[in-house]
């Protein structure tokens, strides 16, 4: 059993999603958004750090998964996004959580089956995969999708490792 915290970073709205994985079974534990309504960036970063730390304390995840920075058209926005990611990662590392990063395209490909999927498609598939009564908020859905991606990637890595081990055992006999 593993608990995974997914984070969709943003300097104004940071989405989070928490799921439990038991084998191939995924269970929704919680999700939401950390909203920073103050204007100055240092105060927003402090709120993101405090919010992520509080979520980690509440859910006690085993793994921390976050979206990678993408190339934005606006350099200022990309820098702010990078700083928001940074404080979220520091919050995880301060709690000794292993950090995993996934590209947005990989997350969409894993959850929807199309790397260029729309936000509404991600919301719908997250709702379906986690058997939720309604679509989660967009940023929370993205965070849950990141957590789901981590589950699938880690599950596939374990299967590949088992296959290699079995292949090696077959050669030794």
UniProtKB/Swiss-Prot annotation:
GO cellular component, one term: cytoplasm
One Pfam match: RuvC
Molecular function as annotated in GO: crossover junction DNA endonuclease activity; DNA binding; magnesium ion binding
Compartments where located: Cytoplasm
PROSITE patterns: RUVC
Catalytic reactions of this protein: Endonucleolytic cleavage at a junction such as a reciprocal single-stranded crossover between two homologous DNA duplexes (Holliday junction)
Cofactor binding summary note: Binds 2 Mg(2+) ion per subunit.
Similarity-based family: Belongs to the RuvC family.
Known partners and oligomeric status: Homodimer which binds Holliday junction (HJ) DNA. The HJ becomes 2-fold symmetrical on binding to RuvC with unstacked arms; it has a different conformation from HJ DNA in complex with RuvA. In the full resolvosome a probable DNA-RuvA(4)-RuvB(12)-RuvC(2) complex forms which resolves the HJ.
Protein's recorded name: Crossover junction endodeoxyribonuclease RuvC
Designated gene of the protein: ruvC
């Amino acid at each position: 059993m593993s608990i995974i915290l997914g984070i969709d970073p943003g300097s104004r709205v940071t989405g989070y999603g928490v799921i439990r994985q038991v084998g191939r079974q995924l269970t929704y534990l919680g999700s939401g958004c950390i909203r920073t309504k103050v204007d100055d960036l240092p105060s927003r970063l402090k709120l993101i750090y405090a919010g992520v730390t509080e979520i980690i304390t509440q859910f006690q995840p085993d793994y921390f998964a976050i979206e990678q920075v993408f190339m934005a058209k606006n350099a200022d926005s990309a820098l702010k996004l990078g700083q928001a990611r940074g404080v979220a990662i520091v919050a995880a590392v301060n709690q000794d959580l292993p950090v995993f990063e996934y590209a947005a395209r990989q997350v969409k490909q894993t959850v929807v089956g199309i790397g260029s999927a729309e936000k509404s498609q991600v919301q719908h598939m997250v709702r379906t995969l986690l058997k939720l009564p309604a679509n989660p908020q967009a940023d929370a859905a993205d965070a849950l999708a990141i957590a789901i991606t981590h589950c699938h990637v880690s599950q596939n890595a374990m299967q590949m490792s088992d296959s290699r081990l079995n292949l090696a055992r077959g050669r030794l006999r």
